[in-house]
From Swiss-Prot:
PANTHER family: METHIONINE--TRNA LIGASE, METHIONINE--TRNA LIGASE, CYTOPLASMIC. GO terms for molecular function: ATP binding; metal ion binding; methionine-tRNA ligase activity; tRNA binding. This is Methionine--tRNA ligase. It is found in: Cytoplasm. Zn(2+) binds at residues 146, 149, 159, 162. The keyword Transcription does not apply. It comes from the Bacteria. ATP binds at residue 335. GO terms for biological process: methionyl-tRNA aminoacylation. Belongs to the class-I aminoacyl-tRNA synthetase family. MetG type 1 subfamily. The lineage of its organism: Bacteria, Pseudomonadati, Pseudomonadota, Gammaproteobacteria, Vibrionales. Residues 585-686 form the tRNA-binding domain.
Length: 686
């Protein structure tokens, strides 16, 4: 009995808009995309959305470092992110930004509803404050010495060396990571969401059975330790949305970030006539809402987010699907080893469908970390996709196109074998539905083994050489093509590009329902290579490219930090005051006001300018090494200061009878001293 199509809204966690997409991000987006494509293949209506998380202190500060506005930076990052996701065939219906009018309106509406319903309170708190930048400092923007193990240069919330967690006020010798200044404590009024009021609802939601066991168990730990009020405000300066009715107070990024799911969908609804925002988000909605996220943000999605929605009168998610981290070759991704691989770097070297297949072959419904072993990656894709599945088509297609004008046999020779393949649809479909992708892939490759075993036993290449075996040859090859068709229908959510090429080859769209009946008396097209095996040299080239990218980033960061440090230095830091001298030593130096009569370049001298100076009744010739700072014509007629009693010095280009005084580090950064109006040539400088 046919059932009505399900209506689903599916989201991926919003990538932060201050960096590139890497293969860790891609695990989640590939996992979600496979699930979404399966749902669409089964006739369900899916709206698949995402957005950039575009607010917060890190974005504000990075834009400042780049010398551009936050808006300019997040626009460029959004373009890069969307290009990367498109490169991996992530089939979003809409990709938006949390820095949007839709998000401003929805975040403000939710806040005001929570406030009206008694879930918002305020109180004064003390925080570390950067006196130079005049800004409150998030924990990660304070650095100092760990209070436990005494390791230096540790963040304000935890120690990378010993793992200790602490508050930034416990750091020894804390410094602002923004300016290097010593922070001070300062009071500020902050606004809080009263999460403990939702404990009963959250416990009931946890016990509903829809959450993963690991997530439900973790939530139980949080309940046992006690829920706390959540600080939802930040002080100016801050890149984000101002809190309605408050001056210089902004929503903390984690308040408006999940609202970005709603905003992206609202943006999609405004583009289409067939979607209704309230139908998907009203409290009694019959549509389904699913979030795919990483295990590092479970706290926000399983506690704060459903509580915010409940408190503001919206529906809650049906489920939050959580995945683990990506490791490479058994270890944390490393920039120095070249295993911190950006999505764009991967796309420059390898087929995205290879990674889609490999991730699918290792993904399950649990919160397990996934290891991208690059040697296994190469071997598995080549063995499974090329040798088992695509090879099934290539070893049979030639006989059909060359001997039978591309026509499959009129009768299907192996109905029992075919029915066995079709019967697997229910099992494989259920595995896709429950996100047990690795088990689905094992089912598919086991069928591929069986199909190849059949072809090996029937040996069409032998039949092709025997007279009178034409009918059997056509039937055997047609069975091989049809079994390949079933396998590719099952693989379509994982490898959409390979599926599209297969559809062109078969002259037929791959659908879940159509495979119930084999293709007979059907014309296929001439076989072309459908998929290329992975060349290990390309994997090595990708690793080397990642190392080069990391080295370039490190060099740029080092340069920026050096420039930042130099900019924070005073002139006295750069060149400390010299040792004290007696007054008599100073008074021995005779400095006079001089008017520059003429100034000209010295032929064959890289640094020198030649001056004629009027010092009040006497003209002096002086050579000065300020050529890189001034053009001669800029100086003529100006008053300056010279040392008049310096012993004349014979130079290659003539006699220098004194010294012009200038300030600055050198090169083009030099400035001659100029007295105020009223000073006259010859006057002594005291």
């Amino acid at each position: 009995m046919a059932t009505d199509p399900r209506q689903l809204l599916v989201t991926c966690a919003l990538p932060y808009a201050n960096g590139s997409i890497h293969l860790g991000h891609m695990l989640e987006h590939i996992q979600a995309d496979i699930w979404v494509r399966y749902q669409r293949l089964r006739g369900n209506t899916v709206n698949f959305i995402c957005a950039d998380d575009a607010h917060g202190t890190p974005i504000m500060l990075k834009a400042q470092q780049m010398g551009i506005t936050p808006e300019e930076m997040i626009a460029a990052v959004s373009e890069e992110h969307q290009k990367d996701f498109a490169g991996f065939d992530i089939s979003f219906d809409n990709y938006h930004s949390t820095h949007s009018e839709e998000n401003r309106e929805l975040a403000s509406h939710i806040y005001l509803e929570l406030k009206k319903n008694g879930f918002i309170s305020s109180r004064t708190i003390s925080q570390l404050f950067d006196p130079e930048k005049e800004m409150f400092l998030p924990d990660r923007f304070v650095k100092g010495t760990c209070p436990k193990c005494k390791s230096e240069d540790q963040y304000g919330d935890n120690c990378d060396n010993c793992g200790e967690t602490y508050s930034p006020t416990e750091l020894i010798n804390p410094k602002s990571a923004v300016s290097g200044a010593t922070p001070v404590m300062k009071d500020s009024e902050h606004f809080f969401f009263d999460l403990p009021q939702f404990e009963s609802m959250l416990k009931e939601w946890t016990r509903s059975g829809s959450l993963q066991n690991e997530t439900a168990n973790k939530m139980q730990e949080w309940f046992e330790s006690g829920l706390q009020q959540w600080d939802i405000s930040r002080d100016a300066p801050y890149f984000g949305f101002e809190i309605p009715g408050e001056k210089d107070k902004f929503f903390y990024v984690w308040l408006d970030a999940p609202v970005g799911y709603m905003a992206s969908f609202k943006n999609l609804c405004d583009k289409r006539d067939d979607l209704n925002f309230d139908e998907y988000w009203k409290k009694d909605s019959t549509t389904e809402l699913y979030h795919f996220i990483g295990k590092d943000i479970v706290y926000f999605h399983s506690l704060f987010w459903p509580a915010m929605l409940e408190g503001a009168g919206f529906r809650k998610p049906n489920n939050v699907f959580v995945h683990g981290y990506v490791t490479v070759n058994g270890a944390k991704m490393s920039k120095s080893k070249g295993t911190f691989i950006k999505a764009s770097t991967y796309l420059n070297h390898l087929d995205p469908e290879c990674l889609r297949y490999y991730y699918a072959a290792k993904l399950n419904s649990r919160i397990d970390d996934l290891d991208l072993n690059l040697e296994d990656f190469t071997q598995r894709v080549n063995a499974d996709v090329v040798n088992k599945i695509v090879n099934l088509a290539s070893r049979n297609a030639g006989f059909i196109t060359k001997r039978f004008e591309g026509k499959l046999s009129a009768e299907f020779a192996e109905p029992e074998l075919y029915n066995e393949f079709v019967a697997a649809a229910e099992r494989i479909g259920q595995l896709y539905e429950t996100r047990e992708f690795s088990r689905a892939i094992r089912e598919i490759t086991a069928l591929a083994d069986k199909a190849n075993q059949y072809i090996d036993e029937k040996a069409p290449w032998v039949l092709a050489k025997e007279e009178g075996k034409e009918k059997e040859l056509q039937e055997v090859s047609s069975v091989g093509i049809n079994l390949f068709r079933v396998l590719m229908a099952y693989l379509k959510p994982v490898m959409p590009e390979l599926a599209a090429r297969t559809e062109a080859f078969l002259n037929e769209e791959l659908t879940w329902e159509a495979i119930a009946t084999p293709l007979t008396d059907h014309e296929i097209t001439k076989f072309k290579a459908l998929f290329s095996r992975i060349d290990p040299k390309k994997v090595e080239a990708m690793i080397e490219s990642s190392k080069e990218d990391a080295a370039a980033e490190a060099a740029a960061k080092e340069k920026a930090e050096a420039e930042k440090e130099q900019a924070s230095q005073t002139e006295l830091d750069k060149e400390p005051i010299a040792d004290e001298i007696e007054f008599d030593a100073f008074s021995a130096v005779d400095m006079r006001i001089a008017r520059i009569i003429s100034c000209e370049e010295v032929p064959k001298a890289n640094k020198l300018l030649k001056f004629q100076l009027d010092i009040g009744g006497e003209t002096r010739q002086v050579f000065s090494g300020i050529k890189s700072a001034y053009k001669p014509e800029e100086l003529e007629g100006k008053l300056t200061v010279m040392v008049a009693n310096l012993k004349p010095r014979k130079m290659k280009f003539g006699m220098s009878e004194g010294m012009i005084l200038a300030a600055g580090p050198g090169g083009s950064d030099l400035w001659i001293l100029e007295p105020h109006e009223g000073a006259q040539p010859g006057m002594r400088v005291m």
